[in-house]
Swiss-Prot record:
NCBIfam families: PRK04966.1. It comes from Sodalis glossinidius (strain morsitans). It comes from the Bacteria. This is UPF0270 protein SG2298. InterPro entries: UPF0270, YehU-like_sf.
């Protein structure tokens, strides 16, 4: 289930995104980005609708994924 980011407390949203960034091993090319830059990039994607917050009832967890990859069960 997609969770609207606007309904999440801003501090909680930041913490969710930071946790996501820390567990993702994304390669940012030749120049590494700071944690704050990575969080800002993901936040921008969430706010623009490119990425969505998804609640998994099976795993009882929230994940962030590209909107195009989301498949409701």
């Amino acid at each position: 289930m997609i969770i609207p980011w606007q309904q999440i407390d801003p501090t909680t949203l930041y913490n969710l995104i930071e946790s996501f960034v820390l567990r993702e091993g994304t390669d940012y090319g030749l120049q590494e980005k700071s944690l704050q830059q990575k969080v800002a990039d993901v936040l921008r994607q969430v706010q623009s609708g490119e990425a969505v917050l998804v609640w998994s009832e099976l795993h009882e967890s929230i994940n962030i994924m590209p909107r195009g990859q989301y498949r409701p069960y």
